């Protein structure tokens, strides 16, 4: 069994939980996921099965799209709704929506983030959330991410001394939307957190086409495997090249080939089938992963 599954992950489930359950449903151990989702986040979790597990790193590289809500007025230990309140800054008057949108725009493009303490990023061999649960604060490494698009998608509404609005973000891998929400609050002068989040797109897969675990289990029981997408969709943003029969033969034997390309990595096709991932070495391309 080989292919890519567009899984709709439910709230309360870790990405590891999803993989574990799918191994039981599909009866195979060779399964991986293409980008971790926090337990409280719902939405698209790309799953690689069989040969497709060799595509995971490329599936993770493609941009992701999220929709969620930001609340101004208080911040939490986890930067989302699951944590304890750590700071409060009441919103006592209406916000200027133009100024809010300008602050949002200032957080697009390449930005620097500091991962939240409640995250799986490792420092000195331990995950940050392990330090956090032990009540320890440690220095966290900065990381560079790219925010391709960040926009407010609703009017600002008010609930007592809180302000809230929904948003949409397209970003690179490694981006913490929780942290982006907190950083926006800081720019506006308020403590803030992310109240909920949905991933609507990842690895070229869309939420409207995603299937829940129960739906996949029903299809397997009925002998239907149409939920398995071909490996080709896992190439993500890699530039695609179509090889001649002679070039394809060389690639199958693991030999270098010459191509008029400049990209570091290429997805090489023979007809409409993915043959290999090629890696640039000097003026030539070397097969990095061969699939057939």
Swiss-Prot record:
InterPro entries: PsdUridine_synth_cat_dom_sf (IPR020103), PsdUridine_synth_N (IPR002501), tRNA_psdUridine_synth_TruB (IPR014780), TruB_C (IPR032819). Its EC number is 5.4.99.25. It is an enzyme of class 5 (isomerase). It catalyses: uridine(55) in tRNA = pseudouridine(55) in tRNA. The active site is at 38 (nucleophile). GO terms for biological process: mRNA pseudouridine synthesis; tRNA modification; tRNA pseudouridine synthesis. Pfam families: TruB_C_2, TruB_N. GO terms for molecular function: pseudouridine synthase activity; RNA binding; tRNA pseudouridine(55) synthase activity. Signal peptide: none annotated. Disulfide bonds: none annotated. Responsible for synthesis of pseudouridine from uracil-55 in the psi GC loop of transfer RNAs. Belongs to the pseudouridine synthase TruB family. Type 1 subfamily. This is tRNA pseudouridine synthase B. It comes from Streptococcus pneumoniae (strain ATCC BAA-255 / R6). The lineage of its organism: Bacteria, Bacillati, Bacillota, Bacilli, Lactobacillales.
């Amino acid at each position: 069994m080989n292919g890519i599954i567009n899984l709709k992950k439910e709230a309360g489930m870790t990405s590891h939980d999803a993989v574990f359950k799918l191994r039981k449903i599909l009866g195979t151990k060779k399964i991986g996921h293409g980008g971790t989702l926090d337990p409280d986040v719902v939405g698209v979790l790309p799953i690689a099965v069989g040969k497709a597990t060799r595509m995971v790193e490329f599936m993770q590289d493609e941009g992701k799209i999220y929709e969620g809500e930001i609340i101004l007025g208080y911040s939490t230990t986890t930067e989302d709704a699951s944590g304890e309140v750590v700071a409060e800054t009441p919103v006592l008057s209406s916000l200027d929506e133009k100024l809010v949108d300008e602050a949002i725009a200032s957080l697009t493009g390449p930005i620097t983030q500091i991962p939240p303490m409640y995250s799986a990023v490792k420092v000195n061999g331990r995950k940050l959330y392990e330090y956090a649960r032990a009540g320890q604060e440690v220095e966290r490494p900065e990381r560079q991410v790219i925010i391709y698009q960040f926009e407010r998608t609703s009017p600002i509404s008010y609930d007592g001394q809180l302000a809230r609005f929904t948003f949409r973000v397209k970003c690179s891998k490694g981006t913490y939307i929780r942290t982006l929400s907190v950083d926006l609050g800081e720019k506006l002068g308020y403590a803030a957190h992310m109240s909920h989040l949905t991933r609507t797109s990842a690895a070229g897969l869309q939420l409207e086409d995603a299937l829940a675990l129960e739906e996949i289990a029903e299809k397997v029981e009925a002998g239907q495997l149409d939920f398995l997408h071909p490996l080709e969709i896992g190439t993500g943003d890699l530039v695609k090249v179509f090889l001649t029969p002679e070039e394809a033969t060389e690639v199958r034997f693991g030999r270098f080939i010459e191509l008029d390309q400049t990209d570091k990595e290429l997805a090489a096709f023979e007809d409409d089938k993915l043959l290999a991932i090629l890696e640039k070495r000097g003026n030539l391309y070397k097969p990095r992963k061969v699939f057939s």
